[in-house]
Amino acid sequence: MRSSVPPVAWRVRSWPLAVLIALAPLWLIGILDRGLWTPDEPREADIAWRMSQQTDRLLPQLAGKPFLEKPPLSYWLSASGIRAFGQPRAPNIVYATVTALSVGATAAAMTDAGAAFLSALLVGTLLMAFRVSVWLAPDACLLAGCALALAGAYRGYTSAPGRRKLGGYTLMHLGAAIGFMAKSAPGWLVPALALLTLIAWERKWSELLRIELYAGLVVQALIIGPWMYAVAVSPGGHEALSTLFWHNIVGRFTRIPGPAALDYTSGHHNWPGKYFLELPVYLLPWTLLAVAALERAWRGVRITGPSGTPWRFAIAATLPFLVILSLAATARDVYAAPAMLGMSLLIALWARESQNKLTALDRFALRGTRALVAAIACVFAAFLSLLALADRLNYQPIDHLEEGIRIAAAAATIIVAAVALRFASRAQRLSNVRGAVVCTFGAYAGALCIAGIAAFPAVDQWQNLTQLADNIHYETRDEPLALLDPDETTIAMLDYRLRTPSSVLDTTGSDAAHVVSGWFRLHGKRSRVLVLLPGHAPGGVTRFLSRFHTIPPPGDGVAGTLATEGTASIVRRFELPQGRRYALLGPPPS
């Protein structure tokens, strides 16, 4: 018997399942089917591993020393992932799911199930949102908390006074608390800016007097309060809280007095307009759709009454946060990830409004996006072909099966993208905007999944810091080891599951030769100093490319200078193909 449930009702109930089915391959491959990659992941893995070993889990630790840049929620969860599955990125599956479904729920409240499905696909594939969701860092948990908070804020704002409004705002506070415990102030800033901007825009000042808006603060107090109290009463707790919430927040906007290690204005420099100029890259492959959405939003935000509220909320969830980021002294692209939530909603609203009534700009955006996805698929295929050719120049036995897989994957990438894009073109001819976007998503996601499965093993070899750390650990097992001006990745890789004993030599304000020679005098002829060398080691890819363009070999940096001056000798080198290079220094020959 044919079901009596109307098709629209069926879609409303089933869009979350459809989202999970569509995005699961991207999440599983991007999160679980690769090793730990720089930047940041080796450091985050060591902090999570340390958290899984700690008896006092109040504060994160990097190589046994307090790491006071973020609150501990994401590290608690990653430590649980290590204990349960041996995988610190396992919680990212939950973060990505919460992010996609929360954005979808917001779009469903704005319009319909079709917008919910589309917005979830978009936030799952926008370059910056996808990168953050699959990366081992607190930003993934922050993004999930912000998505949850925005969903609650919209529901609370648009609901009539009573239980539904209370539930919405309570959800907002829950998401804000999760975001705060993941990465401090941005967890509060994103929903607060969106809601306050919307209230001011619509001059609905009475909303600030609603008891429902503040009742959920109890949730935040119950989540954040016990942890902050426990830290405050612990030894050195007040200094830890000052570092977490003064130097790490205010100190990223302006230079404040304090130790040099806490001067965050000295790295990741910001410059005027950085985030807005880089925004087209963050939005790939949907950049042109975002342009069309912004053009339509110009009219949408001027619609009076509830019909214009979705447009105003999407803008309020995006632009104010980017403006605040632009005022900071420090900047990193991942900081802008929460702004992708509002952009996903904006594009979904555009797709609904342009359905069956395309403008010239809409048509150009759809065609241009298909061309962009086709170009990306070609780049993926070219990269896979390059890997297959480069394998022959790695000075290792050729794995013909792996070579064949990469060539076949390159062909499959092109075929899958071409077929899906053809369906997208047909949907546009029928003025089916949502269908065109979904088919384009299929082309992009299919190409990314196929290329990822084939390419990630090669990238894992370039990023195999575990092997590098094992070799260094074995080579220095009976020798005093020092690290010369190490970065956090070096410290983390030697500590992760190995606890390689070492000391840090800091040359700030000193001469490297004086510091290193002093270490050798103090610890004898068997002592060693590890130095990160500049550039990357050669590999099959660089050897292949050097046939067409001369690639100068990287120098030895400070290690070469110390060896030339007779302060030290290079005892051994450690390197990964296309990856990091290290020199192990010993005392100069007698």
What are these regions (language model features)?
Residues 2-4, 13, 170, 296-590:
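Membrane-embedded architecture of ER/inner-membrane glycosylation machinery
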Residues 2-363, 576-581:
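Membrane-integral, polyisoprenol-dependent glycosyltransferases
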